[in-house]
């Protein structure tokens, strides 16, 4: 049985330890409270240095066994895909209707696609120019992963990069993509938090900002203040409610895997790699079908939204921490300088676009722009953390808009998300797809009257 702990159970143990360390540091250190760094980010950064120093492993009867970054990359992939099963089971919260909310959600979805396109072109352009001027043996298409890493986060980036490496034998895509995603979290906090407070001082916010509660800053609830986070839908004499929800998600994930294998074995070469690479999409698809069927047979009450959110949130925390430990510094050395340049230029471009369109938004411009900056450098959670600074009680509808925007993005973002796996195909017009999105988006927003005179 000893051998079964290596490498994945040992890796999960390390992730858990770093999450606990991150939780303690967030609760005690003012710097991390000021910049709202979550425990998963703090723990991941620590884990990154421990792993790349060669200290990370587990003891065994034959001695110390080192755990490699590949193990954590694999864990990242599965946590991301499993979390999407939970997303598919979730129902949108009530109160998401209304003209302003729908317009705001569409506004965010359009800028989301624009930012991905601009970031990707900045990354690719930087890698191309560097290789032209200084040479190097690396695939410049990996620069496109700046857009995926910043805008879509580590899980989706992992999916794209895995397809590139397994189907087209592109080297170092996974490492570069995860590094872009990891640095994006830092950008969201280091740039986004000062921007939020600057906006408050300048009076750019729509509502009067309040003081953030200590429990929010520390990341730990006060003694006696323990809100309920789930409802039981089964009797514990039969099956625990959390076990029941996990059973549903595990079954759906298994179905997604089976479908992915079928795709891999039956589809033509070149697109068959999407079978496993897009397992997160298949999982979400089967989860949405399962939810519809349960509603049809009057069983939907057995799915508790809060339980599903907690399980999905747990996968995200473990995933973010694992992302940093999936990065190998040695493999980044060849592209280190263009990588840093791309991150800086991409961050500046993201900041400019968010503020430019935010100033001209029909309403709640700063809140939308700030939230989008966090979203399109980190994750949706990063964006909502920044929003909480300027809108502590979520009096504006922006938080709801962020959730609803996925409805629009599901349709609007398809040309990009379904094209990214084919970037390594010679002659594939990925660059021109990004150019088209970049040109069409502002024109569309203008005709939809989403661009007004600057409000701040």
Language-model features, listed with the residues they occupy:
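Hydrophobic transmembrane alpha-helices of secondary-active transporters
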Residues: 18, 45-52, 70-102, 284-294, ...
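Interfacial helix-loop-helix linkers and transmembrane-helix boundary segments
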Residues: 29-36, 60-73, 90-110, 295-309, ...
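C-terminal transmembrane helix pair
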Residues: 319-322, 327-329, 339, 344-452
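Entry/N-cap segments of selected transmembrane alpha helices
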Residues: 93-124, 181, 245, 249, ...
